[in-house]
């Protein structure tokens, strides 16, 4: 029985990153964490392109454009949706998650879900590099690994 695994070497890989402007004070940290991790694992900065979109709801469209361009080995999607007093949060979270997942399945390109969905701003800040690590960095690791798993198959 073969065991297929992916390494964490990003040398020679190209990445697209889609980041939401809404809650940019958190998303900037997610983006920095992702880029830092990609570079530390061998990616060159000129092999990383970033696109900014208004909010999490708009991420899937740009992720699909990147994924179908043929330029990227993986696309990382970053954003933050913080619960409020209305159901808007539920709609945005659900549609962003469905859309991002659909892009990966439709294109065969790894598309990583890095949209924080938190109950409050404190949880978001914790996940952007304070107490709970940096989810942008974790998404970058996931992107590197899944690209290499797919190459090994």
Swiss-Prot record:
Write out the GO MF terms. 6,7-dimethyl-8-ribityllumazine synthase activity
Job description of the protein:
Catalyzes the formation of 6,7-dimethyl-8-ribityllumazine by condensation of 5-amino-6-(D-ribitylamino)uracil with 3,4-dihydroxy-2-butanone 4-phosphate. This is the penultimate step in the biosynthesis of riboflavin.
* One Pfam family hit: DMRL_synthase
The name this protein carries in UniProt is 6,7-dimethyl-8-ribityllumazine synthase
As recorded in UniProt, its EC number(s) are 2.5.1.78
- Cellular component terms per the entry's GO annotation: cytosol; riboflavin synthase complex
Q: Give the reaction(s) catalysed.
A: (2S)-2-hydroxy-3-oxobutyl phosphate + 5-amino-6-(D-ribitylamino)uracil = 6,7-dimethyl-8-(1-D-ribityl)lumazine + phosphate + 2 H2O + H(+)
Gene3D superfamilies documented for this protein: Lumazine/riboflavin synthase
Task: Name the residues that bind 5-amino-6-(D-ribitylamino)uracil.
Answer: 22, 56-58, 80-82, 113
Subunit info here reads: Forms an icosahedral capsid composed of 60 subunits, arranged as a dodecamer of pentamers.
Q: Where does (2S)-2-hydroxy-3-oxobutyl phosphate bind?
A: 85-86, 127
User: Pathway involvement?
Assistant: Cofactor biosynthesis; riboflavin biosynthesis; riboflavin from 2-hydroxy-3-oxobutyl phosphate and 5-amino-6-(D-ribitylamino)uracil: step 1/2
| Protein family per UniProt | Belongs to the DMRL synthase family.
Biological processes per GO annotation: riboflavin biosynthetic process
Major enzyme class? transferase
């Amino acid at each position: 029985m073969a065991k297929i695994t992916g390494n964490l070497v990003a040398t020679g890989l190209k990445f697209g990153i889609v980041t939401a402007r809404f809650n940019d004070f958190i998303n900037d940290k997610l983006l920095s964490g992702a880029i830092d991790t990609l570079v530390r694992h061998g990616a060159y900065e000129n092999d990383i392109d970033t696109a900014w979109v208004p909010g999490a709801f708009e991420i899937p469209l740009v992720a699909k454009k990147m994924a179908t361009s043929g330029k990227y080995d993986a696309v990382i999607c970053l954003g933050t949706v913080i619960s409020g007093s209305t159901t808007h949060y539920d709609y945005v979270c659900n549609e962003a998650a469905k859309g991002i997942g659909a892009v990966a399945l439709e294109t065969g390109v790894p598309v990583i879900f890095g949209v924080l969905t938190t109950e409050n701003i404190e949880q978001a800040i914790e996940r952007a590099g304070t107490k709970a690590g940096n989810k942008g960095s974790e998404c970058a690791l996931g992107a590197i690994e899944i690209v290499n798993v797919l190459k090994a198959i």
